[in-house]
From Swiss-Prot:
Pathway: Amino-acid biosynthesis; L-tryptophan biosynthesis; L-tryptophan from chorismate: step 5/5. Its EC number is 4.2.1.20. GO terms for molecular function: tryptophan synthase activity. This is Tryptophan synthase alpha chain. It catalyses: (1S,2R)-1-C-(indol-3-yl)glycerol 3-phosphate + L-serine = D-glyceraldehyde 3-phosphate + L-tryptophan + H2O. One of its GO terms (cellular component) is cytosol. Keywords: Amino-acid biosynthesis, Aromatic amino acid biosynthesis, Lyase, Tryptophan biosynthesis. The active site is at 43 (proton acceptor), 54 (proton acceptor). PROSITE patterns: TRP_SYNTHASE_ALPHA. Belongs to the TrpA family. HAMAP family: Trp_synth_alpha. The lineage of its organism: Archaea, Methanobacteriati, Methanobacteriota, Stenosarchaea group, Halobacteria. The gene is trpA.
Length: 277
């Protein structure tokens, strides 16, 4: 299933977890729990030591994953060991992509990602202006390249991003780094309005933490929701409390179902989405 196909039957729920957080085996269980909870696409974080786009919650997840031995090679093994059927997106930083393999450049990393079943990438530190080599490699191996659009992104820069993006566009619901919030930013509506004329699914992320958030965002016109910190919080709490992996996985599945149900409820409050051509 392609990423765009995952958005074709209603709002897509796109959860994020850092691969290997807090350890390899538990993390496999947690990611698989997200699919049981209704995930349509799963973003897997390949940890980098300087995650500039992340708030404290995901930064701590990155630390736990790195301390557990996660590397690009181990990440690809992790993807192969997963028992899921939904599309997987690798969220990582360009340094790791560029330096993988015997020669610098993105092609070896993208080739390996395609081999193990990754469908696309989110690379927060890679501007659209510098994405040409990665875009070419993704085109060669049939992978998507997702870009993040901030509330301040407009004009020529927005056009440049939307020329490069495929799969879906990651719409930042507010300014700043990632993290679960108690309310939804009013910038969400204006961000979605700016993207109306672009024919690519729009998934809103940054700060979504419950079903009410999901419902409001989808009712506002989003094609999907991206949720990270609220789920990573569950992993962190379970790790700190010494809870067993099955218990934590059950909590993740419960929140995933709430978020998915919220998204579906939001879709029922808006006119049918026009067919994409």
């Amino acid at each position: 299933m392609s990423l765009e196909d995952a958005f074709s039957d209603g709002p897509a729920f796109v959860p994020y977890l850092a691969a290997g957080d807090p350890d390899y085996e538990s993390s496999l269980e947690y990611v698989e729990a997200l699919e049981r909870g209704g995930a349509d696409v799963i973003e897997l974080g390949l940890p980098f030591s300087e995650p500039i786009a992340e708030g404290p919650t995901i930064q701590n997840a990155v630390v736990r994953s790195l301390e557990g031995g996660m590397t690009p090679t181990r990440f690809f093994e992790f993807v192969e060991d997963l028992d899921v059927s939904v599309p997987l997106v690798c969220m990582t930083y360009y340094n790791l992509i560029y330096r993988y393999g015997d020669e610098p450049g993105p092609r070896p990393f993208v080739e390996k990602a395609a081999e193990v079943g990754i469908e696309g990438f989110v690379v927060p530190d890679l501007p659209a202006e510098e994405a040409g080599p990665l875009r070419e490699a993704c085109d060669e191996f049939g992978l998507d390249l997702v870009f993040i659009v901030a509330p301040t992104t407009r004009g020529e820069r927005l056009d440049r991003i939307m020329e490069q993006v495929s799969g879906y566009v990651y719409v930042q619901a507010r300014l700043g780094t990632t993290g679960a919030q108690s309310s939804v930013s009013d910038q969400t509506d204006s961000s979605l309005e700016r993207l109306t004329d672009y024919d690519v699914p729009k998934a809103v992320g940054f700060g979504i933490s419950d079903g009410d958030h999901a419902e409001r965002i989808v009712a506002s016109g989003a094609d999907g929701i991206i949720v990270g910190s609220a789920l990573v919080d569950i992993v962190a709490e379970g790790h700190e409390n010494g809870d067993d992996a099955e218990t934590v996985a059950d909590r993740l599945e419960t929140l995933a179902r709430e978020l998915e149900d919220g998204a579906v409820a939001g879709a029922s409050q808006r006119p049918p989405h026009p067919e994409r051509t």
